[in-house]
């Protein structure tokens, strides 16, 4: 009997996650100087993390032989102040928000339970749900309507077997927010857990932030992360805000030491450096507008409005997305080919914000390819 015979059938159905390409990979494959590569493919903060973090991390080096605190009171307090949510309604994950997603699926899902996911959206939702035995019911962000959520496609899929519904807002990769009235309708129409993914909410208008719904509704869990505006994608810190009861259940099965000492210190310092946060947010929104307005000038592209730190672009010059992204790679520009997103035709790519210098170079290269 081979190892293939022992592997679960559901795992054999999966395709490996396709992450954004790294500068190192492109430098190797195309012989380009890494310093000249523009990385606009992974929704990162191009200005990095708070410069105060490096100093704090040096203080931690002498403690790396010690286990981290399973729950860091200082980190919990800082998150509480930032979100204006009680500490007891917060749970922190050490693999970004992915850990919170996975823990929720472990808690909720029995074989043949159902999870509703509108597509296109973040692919990790379906992977985590399926591996724990759920059947996926697909709803949709309507392409013909600017990728607005088709709320009826969610509501019509709700059954007595529905355990969870994922709503990403702003949605990845489309960048648009889900209207609050649609989310309210969904939350109030079911007792299934509605997971509102706010990974990019800092870049949106304040009115779209529904984090406080975790106190208003027992069936809401809001996902947040340090990977975007805080510039800590490499430290993998995320958190959930939800009912005290659900936090208690998650704490029973959460990996004990999943959040490293370095990650804890980095997250605390990032929250405390409010000036750097404000700078990154302000310049991030300005960068987004610069790229959006620049791309809108190309008639061969359709650029979708966004409330995140990236935007979705449709190629209409006869090339598919893979051909277009390959042309950019050869010139040292990394964007995200969206061919692997369920529910998207092979003509879309996603581009993240860059520094203003990177944006200028990117738009110049785009003009060479498009025109």
Curated annotation (Swiss-Prot):
EC number in record: 2.6.1.9
Pfam families the UniProt entry points to: Aminotran_1_2
EC supergroup of this enzyme: transferase
Source superkingdom: Archaea
Cofactor: pyridoxal 5'-phosphate
Keywords linked to the UniProt accession: Amino-acid biosynthesis, Aminotransferase, Histidine biosynthesis, Pyridoxal phosphate, Transferase
Protein name per Swiss-Prot or TrEMBL: Histidinol-phosphate aminotransferase
